[in-house]
Structure formats: C-alpha cells, structure tokens
A protein has these predicted regions:
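Juxtamembrane "pre-transmembrane" interface segments
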Residues: 1-22, 123, 134
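Helix-loop junctions and hydrophobic alpha-helical segments within the transmembrane domains
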Residues: 2, 6, 81, 87-112, ...
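Residue-level signature of catalytic and energy-coupling elements of molecular machines
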Residues: 5, 20, 37, 41, ...
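Loop-to-transmembrane-helix entry motif
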Residues: 8-16, 102-113, 138-141, 145
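Hydrophobic transmembrane alpha-helices and their membrane-interface caps
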Residues: 18-81, 85-86, 144
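Hydrophobic, glycine/alanine-rich multi-pass transmembrane helices and their short helix-loop junctions
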Residues: 21-27, 46-61, 111-162
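Juxtamembrane helix-loop transition segments at the membrane interface in multi-pass membrane proteins
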Residues: 85-90, 159-170
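Conserved small/polar residues in nucleotide/adenosyl-binding loops
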Residues: 174-181
Length: 181
C-alpha cells in the first residue's frame, strides 16, 4: 500500500514537472525555463529532508502547502533568470558579469518577497489548542521550501546560468527572432 502511494507521488511529480516546464517554455526562453524548473526539485527536496526533523509527515496538509508555495518557488527563479538573461542580451555583458550583476540587482526584492510570505506563516507556529499541531503543519512545510527556494534562486540558479555558456548561446540562436530583410 505504501509503495503504491509513493509510486503515485513520483508519477504525479514527473507529470507536474513536465507540465510546469512546458508552461514555462511557452512564456520564457527555453534555457531560462529549464533552469527555473530545476529549482523546484531542489527546493522541494531540501524541504523534504528537513520535514522529518521538524516532525512533519507527508500528508494532505503538507502536500497542499507544497502546491501553495510552488508559484513563489517558480516566481523568484523567473525574476533572477530573466534579469540575468536581460543583462546578457540587452547590455551585451559576458556570462559572469551578467550573472553577478543580474542576480544582485534583484536579490533584495526576491529576499523580501520570500520574507513577507514567511512572516505571514510564522504566527501559525504558535497556535495553541487541539488544532495547533494541525495548523503548525502549514508553516513547518512552507518555510523550509521558501528558504531553500531563496538559496536556490540566489546561488544555485545563477551558477547554472553562469556556466550555461555554449548551451545558452545555442538556445539563443533558436529562440531569438530572425532579422527581416
């Protein structure tokens, strides 16, 4: 029974990742969409490692929180990725310069965006009564995901974008509009 449930989770995660990647590719450049999508398993995986230490099990409530914060996980990576790409294309900066300056340029808004969400969930950690432990599942799930997302979007994602090099240029050739004669 447990093995079947785990297999269903894996299958749903794989389908979900494919759908997210397709959706991101529809609106972002393929290279940025790929690296943004890779932030999801990193953020979720990091949180999954912490959940047992925090006394949280994988259940309907914790799974719901993974879905709730998915948009935030993707948003901060999109902001960083697109800004790095913008500097690389519009300002003609090299990989390293566009990555460092592009990340630093948006790091503060990304940080405060995540911080405000954490602050919203934090009071639920202190709820008393019979339902207190149930409500604590929400912040104990959301906060680690958001922290790992912040770390991923400001360190791991820029490192990938910096070393994208030839892959980035290859994608650029096939995603940029061709000049008209």
């Amino acid at each position: 029974f447990l093995e079947d449930r785990i297999n269903i989770l894996y299958k749903n995660f794989a389908i979900g990742m494919c759908l997210v990647l397709i959706l991101l590719t529809m609106f972002l450049r393929p290279s940025v969409a790929f690296w943004v999508a890779m932030g999801i398993p990193i953020s979720f995986g990091g949180a999954l490692l912490l959940l047992p230490l925090l006394g949280v099990t994988i259940n309907v409530l914790s799974t719901f929180m993974f879905i709730v914060v998915l948009g935030i996980v993707v948003d901060d990576a999109i902001i960083v990725g697109e800004n790095v790409f913008r500097r690389r294309i519009k300002l003609k900066e090299d990989n390293f310069t566009s990555t460092v300056k592009g990340t630093m340029e948006v790091m503060l808004p990304v940080f405060f965006g995540i911080l405000t969400t954490i602050v919203v969930f934090a009071p639920m950690l202190d709820l008393a009564g019979d339902t207190g432990p149930i409500w604590r599942t929400f912040p104990l799930t959301a906060i680690p995901i958001l922290v790992f997302s912040l770390i991923e979007s400001t360190t791991i994602l820029p490192a990938h974008l910096n070393h994208a090099g030839e892959w980035f240029q290859y994608c650029l050739l096939y995603t940029s509009p061709s000049p008209r004669d």
